[in-house]
A protein has these predicted regions:
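Alpha-helical recognition/docking segments in bacterial nutrient-uptake
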Residues: 1-94, 98, 167
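Hinge/beta->alpha junction and helix N-cap segments in small-molecule ligand-binding domains
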Residues: 1-8, 27-32, 81-91, 107-159, ...
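A short, gly/pro- and small-residue-rich
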Residues: 53-73, 125, 129-132, 187-198
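Conserved beta-strand segments of alpha/beta enzyme cores
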Residues: 23, 65, 79, 140-143, ...
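Short, well-ordered alpha-helices that flank and scaffold nucleotide-derived cofactor binding pockets
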Residues: 11, 15, 94, 98, ...
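Periplasmic-binding protein-like
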Residues: 39-47, 105-108, 144, 166-177, ...
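Flexible loop/turn connectors
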Residues: 155, 159-265
Length: 265
């Protein structure tokens, strides 16, 4: 499930590129792209891999026009298109608070915020810490964030949350991704914690699996077609204009309501 999101995004990017008569060649390693850079006008990168600053600098020297989708590892070197996950976290908190929920936890994996430095904290968690403090929400002891973005991680962290709060479960949890949320729901069900009766769950990504969990998963949809189309347009414009300033675009998300959380009307 963790890889499915990026697999789907690659497929959507390929479809959009063909529709715009753009030829794509796939590379799995940055060094291979650096070696063959003379054959290309630009690149689009997909995936969560941490790329070292020295490799990114070398790539920029040989291929200065590039767009990163979903991450922004080198804002001063390349363009980027990302889902607006900080706003998504704020929207989720606002939705939960409007539904009378004040004790809100977070479950997620470990990621990197990159630039000249690497910070070992996923941007969704950074946004959650920021917005809960600004909104005056008590998240003390309600944050579980470690490991990969997998079902196993969700199951492990879900079990930890139940063990810590069996008698005082938070009103709701925001989960960083559907792949983790699947494991969280499994852990809650095994422990007799009923969603949404005992706690609500909101996730992010709206992968196909969200329709088939028990309960079905309320999740923020990331429009992959919009990400891909924007990236292609951005790259084509950068190449044609030979601009040196870099553009960074955020795409909004949309809540798809299912059974794990139904907002108050």
């Amino acid at each position: 499930l963790a890889d499915a999101y990026f697999d789907e995004l690659r497929s959507v990017l390929g479809d959009n590129a063909r529709a715009q008569h753009m030829e794509l060649t796939s590379f799995s390693h940055i060094d291979d792209l650096i070696a063959d850079a003379g054959d290309f006008d630009g690149f689009i990168s997909i995936g969560p891999s941490v790329l070292s600053s020295d490799r990114l600098l070398k790539l920029h020297l040989v291929l200065p026009y590039g767009v990163f989708i979903d991450i922004n590892p080198a804002p001063s070197l390349f363009d980027s298109v990302q889902p607006d996950l900080s706003q998504t976290i704020l929207d989720a908190l606002d939705m939960l608070v409007s539904s009378g929920k004040r004790r809100i936890g977070y479950i997620g994996g470990t990621g990197f915020t990159m630039g000249l430095y690497e910070y070992p904290e996923d941007g969704r968690l950074t946004a959650f810490r920021n917005w809960t403090e600004r909104l005056g929400l008590d998240a003390e002891g309600l944050i579980y964030a470690q490991g990969a973005f997998t079902v196993d991680t969700g199951r492990t962290l879900g079990e930890e949350a139940v063990n810590d709060h069996r008698d005082d479960m938070p009103d709701a949890f925001i989960v960083a991704a559907d792949s983790i949320a699947v494991g969280v729901l499994q852990a809650f069900t095994a422990a007799g914690v009923l969603v949404p009766r005992d706690t609500s769950v909101i996730s992010i990504n709206n992968q196909a699996i969200a329709q088939y969990t028990s309960p079905t998963l309320t999740s923020y949809d990331i429009d992959q077609n919009e990400l891909a189309d924007t990236a292609i347009t951005m790259l084509a414009e950068a190449i044609s204009s030979r601009r040196t300033l870099h553009h960074h675009t955020f795409i909004s998300t949309t809540l798809v309501v299912r059974d794990s959380f139904v907002p108050a009307r």
